[in-house]
Amino acid sequence: LQQMAYIKTGRILHYLFSTINTVDDVDASLAKLEMEGLLADSDITAAKLKTMLDKRFQNRQVADWFSGKWTLFNECTILDYDPHDDSVKEHRPDRVMKNGDEVVIVDFKFGSPKPEYVEQVRRYMALTRSMGYSNVSGYLWFVYSNRIEQIS
């Protein structure tokens, strides 16, 4: 039962982060969650989420990602042709940010680290480079622990 609550909270947070462009959007995004009824049958409240977000934004790197200095692409789809099976695959990084020639890719995670997460971000980075961007960095952000892993 606790595991289910943990997963549900992770889904709520994932959705919440997709609606936050800058730190200034937090209150409106939390209000939207409440209006949409996403917190109605949950133990988590907007106040608890706000406290958690405030703590996460104290991390300098996270604060930078939500600073407003970036052109933001939330949940954007990157298409990839696979010649092996003649199919088009869709990839959807959680947050792609661009500032000048710099591109930063962040994937939010709410569980324990897994090797496939690293490969997932590496794939996003390779696809972004194939679009002509050379200055690309990628990160996994484990939101619950507020741990950031840079992917090389």
Feature-to-residue mapping (PLM):
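Short, surface-exposed beta-strand-loop junctions and turns on beta-sheet-rich folds
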Residues: 111-113
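Metal-dependent nuclease catalytic regions and adjoining charged, substrate-binding loops involved
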Residues: 126-152
